[in-house]
Amino acid sequence: MSTCQQVARPLVRCLRQTGPGAATCSTRSVAVAAVRPFSSTPMRKEEGATTTTTTSPVDSTTTPPPLPSATEAKATVADTVVGGPELGSRRRRAALATTGNLPFEQLPYQCFQDARKILQQDRAAKIAQIVKETEKIKLIEARDASEFEGGEAAKQTRIKSLRKYIEELKILADINDPEVKRRFEDGRGDMTKPVYRFMAERRWRSMDYKIIAQRISQFHVVPDLLPAFDPTMDVKLSFRGYQVSPGAILDSRVTEVAPTLRMQVFDKGERLLTVVVIDSDVPDVTHDNFKRRCHFLAANIPWDPSKTVLSLRSVGDRVEGDVGKPWLPPFAQKGSPYHRLNVFVLEQKPGAKIDGEALKKHLENRENFSLKGFREKFDLEPVGFNLFRSEWDEGTAEVMERHGIPGAEVEFKRQKFASLKPPRKARGWEAKRQKPKYKSLWKYVKRIA
């Protein structure tokens, strides 16, 4: 028998089956694919309808389960893509698709279950070590500072070192747990726990941090605004619900409304933040230079790892904080180069609250704002950054008129300077033949005035 006949014979058999209870090839293949590995029992959803157990999944006497209807399949896909919790890795979703309604931690894979046992043993060892280190801290706290060689400073340094080691053990205890990874991939991680903060920071530094660091160097934020700066928190920018990539040029009608910041800190505890938005490219015609303008400033904003969204429009109203300068829409006059709008997040010293009246007094004028001087006066530490750019567009004049900003009719042009070189004598074949003796050739020669 030829190879073609061997391949075609099963297809012909499938086509000849015309009975109402006969299974087609496609249905039988689905039934074979739906069989759970490492088990000969039916799936949970089929236990009510199935009364016998079959050892061979391809037995011709067994009627395969019916295919789901188009409506059910469409609902399942929509559940997964739009609102369902299964947003993690494709490998995990593929494993869940072949195991029915089993819980994630009970997947019937021998290797998976053996790995979970090893991870549980390792976690128990880490927890025992955490208890041991906690007892050490209690003993050190009970001792007098005079017993340490460096006094109270050495005692606090030792306690701080042990607490840092305990935080590392907490991360190592759960970093490989499949359930922890699943929650983090699905966006349901508890940021009050160190393991989720560690995973979030690792993901941020893998790409988003590199992009922000590149923009800081590419747009010369350092040293134009600060002598040195390395961000340590994630800050994302969105206008009217749409996230903006760092450094994007936005329409002035979009930036007319104050943005929303998605901020994520990676260390525990509550702190007070200050948000500053600066235009670092305001033309200064008098001095033929550029100056800076403050477009927004708010201080004393409480923040912790569990918070993620800050609407600048809500500061001082629904969100606690003191507004030094409300939002001023970014604008650029016609002919000027693009303006860099820098969004800085600065952390205040623990327990140090900025006086609102002193803040407003320091910012009586938006122009000539110095971030370096503001930072030194109020003892702030820059921790987060993002930026966008603004140019003159068809809606800039309307935005400036609505908010009472003068200068919409101003247009910047490059100033032309007369050359300081003396006039150059004409040279070339035509220049030599401008004399009267070449008058017969003038009709062929270009006249040079």
From Swiss-Prot:
It is found in: Mitochondrion. The keyword Mitochondrion applies. Gene3D superfamilies: 1.20.58.1180, PEBP-like. Residues 50-62 have a biased composition (Low complexity). It holds the Pfam family PBP. It comes from the Eukaryota. One of its GO terms (cellular component) is mitochondrion. Residues 37-72 are annotated as: Disordered. Keywords: Mitochondrion. Component of the mitochondrial large ribosomal subunit (mt-LSU). Mature N.crassa 74S mitochondrial ribosomes consist of a small (37S) and a large (54S) subunit. The 37S small subunit contains a 16S ribosomal RNA (16S mt-rRNA) and 32 different proteins. The 54S large subunit contains a 23S rRNA (23S mt-rRNA) and 42 different proteins. Component of the mitochondrial ribosome (mitoribosome), a dedicated translation machinery responsible for the synthesis of mitochondrial genome-encoded proteins, including at least some of the essential transmembrane subunits of the mitochondrial respiratory chain. The mitoribosomes are attached to the mitochondrial inner membrane and translation products are cotranslationally integrated into the membrane. Belongs to the phosphatidylethanolamine-binding protein family. Mitochondrion-specific ribosomal protein mL38 subfamily. This is Large ribosomal subunit protein mL38. It comes from Neurospora crassa (strain ATCC 24698 / 74-OR23-1A / CBS 708.71 / DSM 1257 / FGSC 987).
